[in-house]
Amino acid sequence: NKPKDTVTTSDDPQARRTVMDLVKGACNERIYPVGRLDRNTTGVLLLTNDGDLASKLTHPKYLKKKIYHVHLDKNLTKADMEQIAAGIQLDDGEIHADAISYTDDVKKDDVGIEIHSGKNRIVRRIFESLGYKVMKLDRVYFAGLTKKGLRRGEWRYLTEQEVNFLRMGSFE
């Protein structure tokens, strides 16, 4: 469960805290992050020593499901929500959410968004393109995995069943 102010890299030339610092001594094999979460994004991040699995989970053709909880600087209008679902044009092409909804009936500045794209900073760019500022971004689901039971900065080993599901592609 990646905390804020942690860089998703194996080695940072600026000597900032990295996700590798969180798992120091976890195993003898060389492990590395699967995909990226920017420094201020929190949540589910997978680390592995299996290059084939990492490739399968990050390659665009496999379209792995990611769900984020987004806290915005202001209420998201229904019209903007519908536009995100229908698709918006960004500098690097069109993107649409597979699902988007308010996480609370009252607070319209908290949103859940499901996407399959792995483009860099895609969730932030979606909302920024419509004039919103993302105040907090938390990935709550990635390729069948959640952060349930883990506090920020904590990690756990995957179960044998989870590893098998990931290897077989038995996840969204």
Language model features with spans:
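Basic, flexible Lys/Arg- and Gly-enriched helix-loop patches that mediate nucleic-acid binding at interfaces
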Residues: K2-E172
